[in-house]
């Protein structure tokens, strides 16, 4: 089953706490262009559905960033969970090598 997630580029200077209040989860994409990383935001409801269907470091996810015209295969590298609330706090994606 192929999972597809659409993200947005995180606005410059935006505060993570404000993003979470607005219903977004901060995220990063690593390895898409060498050592460069991109700060992203993902809708919190999309993240909840993703975490029910995907396993960390095992499930391949199609990530789409329309603002950058980038689409590629990634894996869910890390999920940080809020210790008191038990909700996703931050997620990291790792681009897989094109093969």
UniProtKB/Swiss-Prot annotation:
GO terms for molecular function: 5S rRNA binding; structural constituent of ribosome. InterPro entries: Rbsml_bL25/Gln-tRNA_synth_N, Ribosomal_bL25/Gln-tRNA_synth, Ribosomal_bL25_short, Ribosomal_L25_dom. Pfam families: Ribosomal_L25p. GO terms for biological process: translation. CDD domains: Ribosomal_L25_TL5_CTC (cd00495). This is one of the proteins that binds to the 5S RNA in the ribosome where it forms part of the central protuberance. Belongs to the bacterial ribosomal protein bL25 family. This is Large ribosomal subunit protein bL25. It comes from Nostoc sp. (strain PCC 7120 / SAG 25.82 / UTEX 2576).
């Amino acid at each position: 089953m192929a999972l597809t997630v659409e993200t947005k580029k995180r606005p410059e200077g935006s505060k993570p706490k404000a993003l979470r209040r607005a219903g977004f989860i901060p995220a990063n994409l690593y390895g898409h262009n060498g050592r460069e990383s991109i700060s992203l935001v993902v809708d919190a409801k999309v993240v909840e559905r993703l975490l029910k269907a995907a396993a960390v470091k095992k499930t391949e996810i199609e990530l789409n960033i329309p603002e950058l015209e980038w689409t590629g295969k990634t894996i869910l590298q890390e999920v940080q969970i809020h210790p008191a609330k038990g909700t996703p706090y931050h997620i990291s994606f790792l681009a897989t090598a094109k093969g």
